[in-house]
Design a protein with these regions (language model features):
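Short, surface-exposed loop/turn motifs at beta-strand boundaries within globular domains
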Residues: 18-20, 94, 129
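Short, polar/flexible loop-turn hinges at active-site or ligand-entry regions and domain interfaces
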Residues: 107-108, 127-131
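Short, flexible loop/turn segments with low-complexity composition
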Residues: 129-140
Length: 160
């Protein structure tokens, strides 16, 4: 199953807008209607230990020789559904067909990625609606259980 972005299927990394660092997504479990909002990066920097030949090629280099190199590697974005434990359990049971994956926003930096993840989680009120969302925390700082006793009402802010 591929991702959907602006009503188009995305099945390859070349189909993303140019300079995309990552994206904010919504995974929806169709039978229950529950969703999960999260973020995913497209590339990872991975430390790879230098082999004997690569180390030998560095002889004569002044100063400390590097013992590793950074390798840019594509992430598992194509097969990713979310990090939430309930979603993982459903996937282990072989229920991938029951999920719909939608990209909400593509971004160019790590900071924007975190900002828009939080923005969408707040806009959709993921912590206030535990019957509609799998999300049980935002940033590992705000938790559903901490808001259990609070009655949420629609706030109307009047502007002058």
């Amino acid at each position: 199953m591929s991702w959907t972005y602006k009503q188009h299927e995305i099945g390859d990394i070349t189909q993303f807008p140019e300079n995309t660092f990552g994206f904010v997504y919504m995974t929806t479990h169709k039978p229950t209607g529950k969703s999960y909002i999260g973020k995913k990066v497209l590339f990872h920097n991975q430390k790879k230990k230098l082999g004997k030949k690569e180390l030998a090629a560095l002889t004569g280099v002044v100063g400390r020789r590097p013992s590793y190199k950074l390798v840019v590697k594509e992430s598992d974005w194509m097969t990713y559904y979310g990090s939430q434990t309930d979603i993982k359990k459903l996937l282990v049971e072989g229920k991938k067909d029951e999920f719909e994956r939608t990209i909400l926003k593509c971004v160019e930096t790590k900071k924007q990625l975190t900002y828009f993840e939080i923005k969408y989680q707040m806009l959709y009120q993921v912590l206030e609606k535990p019957d509609e969302f799998f999300n049980d925390n935002i940033l590992g700082k705000f938790f559903t259980k901490d808001l259990a006793d609070i009655v949420f009402e629609d706030l109307v802010v009047e502007r002058k």
